Amino acid sequence: MAAKVEPFWKRKTLAQLDQDEWESLCDGCGLCCLQKLEDEDDGSVYYTRIACKLLDLQSCRCTNYAERIRFVPDCIQLTPAQADEFQWLPPTCGYRLVAEGKDLPLWHHLVCGDPERVHKERISQSGRMLSETQVAEDDWEDYLIFRAG
């Protein structure tokens, strides 16, 4: 009987992941691509329903991932070196969970094999977002959905 091999996210640190493993941790929820607002009084960060102009509002994937920095210079590029800063990511985020030493949820595509499950379980905001091109920045506060952290 062959020994059961633990999934890579359970046996490796973020720094040990290769590029494919790193990219596969993304569950495709698109929440990191939503615009966020910071409370000037206490520094709290709030997610809005307003998505980056490059985010596909249904699939929750970037429409130009390879060149996103060219079109959105302030696009956040997650790296293993930033793991201690991942608390702003949603508590369901694969990057954050692995950084915190936790397992991936049952709906994560690496666990269940279904990349659409993140949408079926309504973890993503698929179909519930607006593009930043549709809403004036002064109105983003009207579209708050949750507090980060």
From Swiss-Prot:
InterPro entries listed in its UniProt record: Puta_zinc/iron-chelating_dom, UCP006173
Domain of life: Bacteria
Annotated family: Belongs to the UPF0260 family.
PANTHER family listed in its UniProt record: UPF0260 PROTEIN YCGN
Name of the molecule in the record: UPF0260 protein PA1299
Originating organism: Pseudomonas aeruginosa (strain ATCC 15692 / DSM 22644 / CIP 104116 / JCM 14847 / LMG 12228 / 1C / PRS 101 / PAO1)
